[in-house]
Amino acid sequence: MNVNKNINNIFFIFAFSHLIIWTLVPTITNKNLPLDTIEALAWGSNLEWGFNKHPPMSAFFPEVFYQIFGAQDWSYYLLSQIFVLISFFYVFKFANEVLQDVKLGFISTILLSSIYFYNFTTPEFNVNVCQLPFWSLVVYYSWRIYDSKDIKFLDCLLVGIFAAIGFLSKYLFIYL
């Protein structure tokens, strides 16, 4: 039990470190926001149900952060990392339940973080980053439905909501 608690603490230290590093480094080193983030901000000022290239959620979330933080570049890097950390958290939970081993769950998350799309490209908030947490959430809650003896309405509802938001994040989400 104590080992599991330590692994959970290590996971949260890892997640917090990831958040700080991947928010701080681009904030310090980049002179401009990435182009996809600028495009999302432009679209966010005039929200519609879709744009000529992408669905609306990649513009909606930056617009929410713009309304909260204003024109602060660091906030959009933070937004990207929040989306990545939600993915990490649900992959960690999913792996813990499927593998029934907290250590293997943590290793799964570390391996996921080594994938290019979960580190070097994440400072640029775009449709690819926007869909990440929804993939993890849909898989996790689908697993809960599959693994449970009695299907809970809330799990079904959450799968539907997260799948819908995921589809509105990137149309290729439908392949899930």
What are these model-derived regions, one by one?
Residues 120-131:
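Short acidic/glycine- and proline-prone juxtamembrane loop motifs at membrane-interface regions
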Residues 15, 105-116, 163, 167:
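Short helix- or helix-capping micro-motifs
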Residues 96-99, 138-155:
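Membrane-interface transmembrane helices that cradle and orient dolichyl/undecaprenyl
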Residues 9, 91-114, 132-133:
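Transmembrane-helix signature of polytopic, membrane-embedded enzymes
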Residues 1-22:
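Start-transfer (signal-anchor) and selected internal transmembrane alpha helices
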Residues 46, 154-171:
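Membrane-interface alpha helices of multi-pass inner-membrane proteins
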Residues 25-40, 50-64, 70-75:
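Extracytoplasmic catalytic/substrate-binding loops of multi-pass membrane glycan-assembly enzymes
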Residues 62-66, 77-90, 115, 131-134:
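Transmembrane alpha-helices of multi-pass, membrane-embedded glycan-processing enzymes
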